[in-house]
Amino acid sequence: MKVFKIAIYSFLISGSLWSCIPSYSAYPREYNHAKADFKKQKVFVVNKDLESEFKILKHSDIYEIVEDSTHAAKITLHPMMKRTPPCGNPMIGSMLTVGLLPSGFPYDIAYSYDLAENSTTKNYQYKLQVYQSLWLFNIFRLGRTFSKQSGKALLGSYIASNK
């Protein structure tokens, strides 16, 4: 009887953990369909060691990132500030229903960088919104990572600010 109880608890815990598959979306929703159909400026990223920020910039496709700094503008990334909900209560529904009940979390991101070109430096600041969804059926949306969707939100914000 004790072995049966342990097996049931193990199954429930592992099922709960496996059922909550994350997927991310850029907000507003029209940013998911934004395309970089403009001439891209060649830039060299000075501090690629900020990996998350660099991946977001790379996925945004706003600039053509080059490895040679001689004939390109220089971008200095700033650490992004991420605000998430203070607790994980929305996730409980997904865990108890083995992923059948979707739940989600909004992420508010303050993203900024400096673009230095011809002895002038311009600071760019964006407020990005990304929504994380936890749901069993997100298994069909596996390519929607945080950095890719944040990149789409950055591209959408960039296009909206340059209209």
Task: Describe each model-derived feature in a short phrase.
Residues 17-37:
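Bacterial Sec signal peptide processing site at the extreme N-terminus
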Residues 76-121, 137-145:
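Surface-exposed short loop/turn segments
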Residues 119-157:
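Short secondary-structure boundary motifs at beta->alpha junctions and helix caps
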Residues 48-59:
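Amphipathic alpha-helical segments
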Residues 1-22:
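Sec-dependent bacterial lipoprotein signal peptides
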Residues 60-72:
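Short acidic low-complexity segments
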Residues 58-61, 154, 158-163:
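Sec/Tat-exported extracytoplasmic proteins
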Residues 30-50:
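Post-signal peptide N-terminal segment of mature Sec-exported envelope proteins
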